[in-house]
């Protein structure tokens, strides 16, 4: 029996989002042993329970108020939302924030030897998918009628097996499509992981914990997107150096012992620092350029 005074968070037990979700919670300072086969794990240092479940169960657990928070792919969330609306329900939840992992796209794919002149080419065709509602919404908007072939796995083999004329499936690199004689022809939905919260009243202690967790998640994401940069630079070219680092805050400038014309610069940059940028910094006279990852960050 779950303790209702503890914050309940549902994450994917295994699969595409599992490792990233676990890493995010760990970097937020939640100490928990997720290396066992237990479906419910209790945090050691916070009143938090982690439920490890199938990804397509997470939206329902949040919408039905069984858990307080869930980390889920937007594609799975949107499919469940459309499914419930199709059954006459009015599902409610709050999206707290989009996360920086789990990126994918839901795409239409057809056999490589078939011509493609847009979605109209699928009119009257049979399409295999695990996302029938997202597919229907997209093709309805295009005025295309089709027959759906619902598969919960190995969707890419459907055309070769004679089950469908085309597929609608998640794509990352496209290698699986190519291996099955298919090509990606149209992206119908782009997705990332997101953090969602159940609708309705929340105990003050839980809401305070959620607010703390959101602040930490923001810090983790900012840290991953930022770099700490240190270098020595000519005093007379500081503004040129700073101009090469868009997104950087104004730097900390420190004197160098025994140097009158050069200073030490420290700054946080939210931009990716490419080799080309470092070469331009060097051309301006910068030296000892260090680019370091940031573990935690709070504004």
UniProtKB/Swiss-Prot annotation:
Superkingdom as given in the UniProt entry: Bacteria
Q: Which UniProt keywords apply?
A: Amino-acid biosynthesis, ATP-binding, Cytoplasm, Glycosyltransferase, Histidine biosynthesis, Magnesium, Metal-binding, Nucleotide-binding, Transferase
Q: What is its EC number?
A: 2.4.2.17
- What pathway does the UniProt record associate with this protein? Amino-acid biosynthesis; L-histidine biosynthesis; L-histidine from 5-phospho-alpha-D-ribose 1-diphosphate: step 1/9
PANTHER family recorded: ATP PHOSPHORIBOSYLTRANSFERASE, ATP PHOSPHORIBOSYLTRANSFERASE ATP-PRTASE
The cellular location(s) given in this protein's UniProt record come to:
Cytoplasm
| PROSITE patterns the record matches | ATP_P_PHORIBOSYLTR
One Gene Ontology term, aspect cellular component: cytoplasm
Q: Which HAMAP family match?
A: HisG_Long
- Stated name of the protein: ATP phosphoribosyltransferase
Q: What is the lineage of its organism?
A: Bacteria, Pseudomonadati, Pseudomonadota, Gammaproteobacteria, Enterobacterales
The family note in this entry says: Belongs to the ATP phosphoribosyltransferase family. Long subfamily.
What controls its activity? Feedback inhibited by histidine.
Annotated organism of origin: Salmonella paratyphi A (strain AKU_12601)
Secretion signal, residue range per the UniProt entry: none
Its UniProt entry gives the catalysed reaction(s) as: 1-(5-phospho-beta-D-ribosyl)-ATP + diphosphate = 5-phospho-alpha-D-ribose 1-diphosphate + ATP
Functional note: Catalyzes the condensation of ATP and 5-phosphoribose 1-diphosphate to form N'-(5'-phosphoribosyl)-ATP (PR-ATP). Has a crucial role in the pathway because the rate of histidine biosynthesis seems to be controlled primarily by regulation of HisG enzymatic activity.
């Amino acid at each position: 029996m779950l303790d209702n005074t503890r914050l309940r968070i549902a994450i994917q037990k295994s699969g595409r989002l599992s490792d990233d979700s676990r890493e995010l919670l760990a970097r937020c300072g939640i100490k928990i042993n997720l290396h066992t086969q237990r479906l419910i794990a209790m945090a050691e240092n916070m009143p938090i329970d982690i439920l490890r479940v199938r990804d397509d169960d997470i939206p329902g657990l949040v919408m039905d108020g069984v858990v307080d928070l869930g980390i889920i792919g937007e594609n799975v969330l949107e499919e469940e939302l459309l499914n419930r609306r199709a059954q006459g329900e009015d599902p409610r939840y709050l999206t707290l924030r989009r996360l920086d992992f789990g990126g994918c796209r839901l795409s239409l794919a057809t056999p490589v030897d078939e011509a493609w002149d847009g979605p109209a080419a699928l009119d009257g065709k049979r399409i295999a998918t695990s996302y029938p509602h997202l597919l229907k919404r997209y093709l309805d908007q295009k005025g295309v009628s089709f027959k759906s072939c619902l598969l919960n796995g190995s969707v890419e083999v459907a055309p070769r097996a004679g089950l469908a004329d085309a597929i609608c499936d998640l794509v990352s690199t496209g290698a699986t499509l190519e291996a099955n004689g298919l090509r990606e022809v149209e992206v119908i939905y782009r997705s990332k992981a997101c953090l969602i919260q159940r609708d309705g009243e929340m105990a003050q202690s839980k809401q305070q914990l959620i607010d703390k967790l959101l602040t930490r998640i923001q810090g983790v994401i900012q840290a991953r997107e930022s770099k700490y940069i240190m270098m020595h630079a000519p005093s007379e070219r500081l503004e040129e150096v700073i101009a090469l680092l868009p997104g950087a805050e104004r730097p900390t400038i420190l004197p160098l012992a025994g140097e009158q014309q050069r200073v030490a610069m420290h700054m946080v940059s939210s931009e990716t620092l490419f080799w080309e940028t470092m070469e331009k910094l060097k051309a301006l006279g910068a030296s000892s350029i260090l680019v370091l990852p940031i573990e935690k960050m709070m504004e």
